[in-house]
């Protein structure tokens, strides 16, 4: 919600799905004057202890990459079993191109494997 991080600037010209200006405007409207550091507005500032296993995927070319890595580190520090699955060269929402990109199909397969592993009775 604070719309900050290295990837906001570094990937602004690469991420074709997310517009930093529009996202900042949307965050401001959503927050309606509330501090963006409020845990209910952003999990980056929440107490993550006790969360179930967490799977985070991000593309290295998306503007939300910094948020994704920060969330993964915070979750890890809180004792959460977290998997950060980074995809080189991908922008936000590359999964939508499942019929075009082998990376999208592979990413979705990683999601399936994570869910299957964590929902199987015997591990």
Where are these regions (language model features)?
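Alpha/beta-hydrolase superfamily serine-hydrolase fold, recognizing
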Residues: 1-123
């Amino acid at each position: 919600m604070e719309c900050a991080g290295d990837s906001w600037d570094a990937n602004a010209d690469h991420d074709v799905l997310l517009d930093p200006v529009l996202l900042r405007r949307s965050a401001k409207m959503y927050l309606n004057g509330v501090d963006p550091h409020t845990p209910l507005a952003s999990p980056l500032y929440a107490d993550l202890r006790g969360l179930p296993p967490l799977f985070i995927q991000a593309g290295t070319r998306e503007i939300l990459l910094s948020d994704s890595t920060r969330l993964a580190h915070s979750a890890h520090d809180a004792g959460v079993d977290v998997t950060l699955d980074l995809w080189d060269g991908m922008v936000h929402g590359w999964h939508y191109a499942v019929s075009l990109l082998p990376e999208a199909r592979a990413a979705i397969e990683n999601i399936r494997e994570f869910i299957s592993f964590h929902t199987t009775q015997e591990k």
